[in-house]
Every structure is written in structure tokens, then in C-alpha cells.
Amino acid sequence: DWSNPGEVLAFDLTNCNNKQIIIANNLYRNHGFYQTREAIYIGSDNGLFKLTLENDNFSLVKLLSGKIGDVCVCDIDMDGQNELITIKEMHGNCIDVYHINNGTYWKQYSFTENIEFVHAFTKGEINKKNVVFIGVRKGNANTLLLQHDYDGYHMNSLDESVGAANLSFVNINNKNYLGAANHTLS
């Protein structure tokens, strides 16, 4: 019911040890979880955190304040630095893009137009450009495509009234596919 704080745990599975390590506690609605090769990103009502492991030591750094429901990490503007694409609040109605500059993330773009209960993120590459796909469960229940070009960020609708709960992008035999677990027939 999310009324109590949660925690982030790691388990040392070496030699079937199953040793539990508490990484963070007192995180409310720690629902967002995104993994890259370098880090794990955790969204919660306490903010957005980056978890790394170096020399068997966990490090947890707060990147953003405020209620962050979920996150996707992607170099969407193709400048060599990953942006943070977030859902403001858990299952919220605002998508924000943060760009890093001098070690600090700054909001560059917000999208709130007719979206409610934003639920799913996945990233992909189309025509040699990084893009992010977004599933919206209520309101217009669209599947959205976020992209960046010479004049900024753009959000386009790929599908309407389907309410994707999960999305997955894959390239097979040089063809791009977006899989969607929809709660409504299109």
C-alpha cells in the first residue's frame, strides 16, 4: 500500500552465501528501477538516486530531488552525455528530460499534454538516433515516441487508447520492433 518506507537491497550470492546488504532505507514509493552497465537508478518519493559498485563498496548518490516515479537513461540528444527521462511522481502525469551540465542535472523539457498514469519506458535507436518509447495507461492511453533533433525535443503518438503497461524495443535482422503489453485492444 506504499504507506511504509521501503529499502533497496543487494544480495551477495557468492558461494550460495545469500548475504543481504541494505543499500538504502526509508525510501517512500521506491518504484522506479533502471539498470545500465555502470549503475542502477532508483526513483522514489525521496528523489532519484544513482547506485554504483566499486571495489566491493556500494555508493548511493542523489541526482534529483522531488518525487520521481521512474527513469530511463539515454543519450537522446546524441551529445555523448546521458539524459535522465523521468516520470514525475509514481504513475504521474508529467515526463521530464534532464540534461547534465557541470555535474548538475537541469530540466530541459517537460511533457504533460493529455497524459495520466505514465507507466512504461524503453529506449531504442531509429535511423541512427536514440529515442525513448513511453507507455501511458490512462487519459488518452497512448504509446509515445520521444525524440530530439536540431530544434529540440518532440513527442509523437504511435498508438492511441491502448494503455501499454510494459514496452520492449528490439532489432532483429536489421528491423526495429516495439513490443507492447497493452491493457486495451487497439
What do the predicted segments below correspond to?
Residues 1-186:
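Beta-propeller-forming repeat regions
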